[in-house]
């Protein structure tokens, strides 16, 4: 068995990733492909918790900018993350991996409530834990939820799995001359306003000294990251 550098990881996925080329909604084939990448590290013995955004269905911040009440918009965004969580749960279980969705907003007919100790027990038993509905509070992003759950569940690393290979000085989708950073400090991310995660999430990771690895969700990026290989961009240290 390949050597893991980390025992427990929180993987953050954007909601948009689940839409594939459709840009909106959930594409089952794309979800299955992403889950196959996650299954690879599960089979290596990694304990995995997931936080998934909801931007493929509803984005609270942009809706509030268009006149909707911010709290109402954020709650709608949180509900969107539950839809995504159930879709990923279904795909992972089809691959043979027991998965539990734990929601910060109680909806007992659909998923379990998020209780930290319960989540830890699931992880210890080898189940995937998907933390849904953000923090359960408006004004907090799913990036912040990922950082918070990562701390609560004592994860060794937070992996932000994206469509690109790491963190760049500018958008690589729009600029061919974009340069990828191999390593950054938390302070550099904040000072340069790099779009790794929002500032609240970065600050939480900095205060608790939890590294963030930004890598491609495909190309075996997640597997290489948890093995400690030089992949993507790592954010750590002062």
Swiss-Prot record:
Inhibited by UTP. GO terms for biological process: 'de novo' CTP biosynthetic process; UDP biosynthetic process. The keyword ATP-binding applies. CDD domains: AAK_UMPK-PyrH-Ec. InterPro entries: AceGlu_kinase-like_sf, Asp/Glu/Uridylate_kinase, Uridylate_kinase, Uridylate_kinase_bac. It catalyses: UMP + ATP = UDP + ADP. Homohexamer. Belongs to the UMP kinase family. Catalyzes the reversible phosphorylation of UMP to UDP. This is Uridylate kinase.
